Curated annotation (Swiss-Prot):
Residues 36-64 have a biased composition (Acidic residues). This is rRNA biogenesis protein RRP36. Component of the 90S pre-ribosome involved in the maturation of rRNAs. Required for early cleavages of the pre-RNAs in the 40S ribosomal subunit maturation pathway. One of its GO terms (biological process) is maturation of SSU-rRNA from tricistronic rRNA transcript (SSU-rRNA, 5.8S rRNA, LSU-rRNA). Associates with 90S and pre-40S pre-ribosomal particles.
Amino acid sequence: MALSGILNKRVTAYRADENELEDDFSSSEELNTLSSEDDEDEDENDESENEETPDNTSSEDDGDNDIKSSLSQISFGALAKAQQSLGPLKKGAKRKHGSEEEEEEEENNTNTKYKKSKSDALNELRERIRRAKEEKASKSERSRDSELLDKKHKEARSSKHAPAVQSSKYAVSRRRVVVDGENVAQAKSRDPRFDSAVQSYSHGVKSSSYSTSHSDLAAAKNYAFLNEYRDAELKELEEKLRRSKEDDEKARLKKMITSMKDRKRAMENRERERQVLAKHRKKERELIKEGKKEKAWFLKKADLKKEALKEKYESMGAKERQKGIERRRKKVASKEKKEMPRSRRIVEG
């Protein structure tokens, strides 16, 4: 009965999963282990039976008879199923060789799949890189087109007098201009003899409200000999003008002579104003000392010019004064005529 139970187990194991190869291997291993265990049990039983008395031999004969009777009772369908289940196991070497071939095929398939997957991944990566490059190129083209459109838009102003518009989306330069060579103050040479900062305190001359007078006074005191040189140069130029015959040379000499005379006249006027101012200050100090005044009265610039002009005409002779007054009248008349409207200027002319 034990053999029929084993056969039934084999049949059920095969029925459980006929399609899977791994279950067949497991069932074959179980059958081998069971058969080996049965053989070991039978060997042990034989050894024990050989060692035992003849009574045991009779019991063995009874057991064989029982097995034969049990085998005779098994149906042909069960035997066919058992044969089907045991058929592949009898060809163990071939089955094993077939399994190795299947494993090799599976490995080859996996290798080919891995290779295909690797090649597919590489192709996909290349495709992505190609797409990225195409997108980048398209973006650069779009940016160029947009820049051109912006430039055209910037150039197209409402009028030529309209201010130019510049976008603030420009990258800041990484370089910073620490010292600009154009805006750096260049070293200028100066002569301290003619510098007002030095002359204002030279020779005991203190600063006053008339900043132009004290510097001129210091320069006049220190370089009074230059007036003699200027007079000599003026006479020399007049002599050259008298001897010259070319028109261009005469025009150039006349221009130089007039500029020198104007400069000399301006210096004389400044000196006259300085003398008038000095006389006025001296007079005011004397009045304060005498107690006739409590506070000094300071001349305005307009009053100072009037006093200087009055002193100038008083120092002149009769004919020279008349010429000076006539010259002054013409100068004032021309100035007023320039300020007059054009319609009135024509009527009076």
